[in-house]
Amino acid sequence: MLRTIARIDFLSIAEQFARRVKSELDADADVYLFGSFARNDANEHSDIDVAVVSRTFGKDISEDYGKLAVLAHHVNPNIEAHPIVFDDWINTTPFTNEIKKDGVLL
């Protein structure tokens, strides 16, 4: 992690990222905070894991990661953004199960 994030700041950072995703990429995307911050067991080395579920993802997953990485970097370099193809969200994978279990919809 590039810097320590105060416990109060992480939700605000994730919400700011969600607003940018919805305004710049996909207004209908669902954005979830997941991982250690969502489970409330983050430490000074934790990044902010955010999943973006969108029907626009899937044609080129590398491009999807790239778009999210650019947005994430502009909001906070500690954000680790993960594009989720809508079909994977519906059909459920081990990764999406983790997000559904512990994730917080922003």
Mark where each language-model region is.
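Catalytic core of pol beta-like nucleotidyltransferases
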Residues: 1-30, 38-44, 55-106
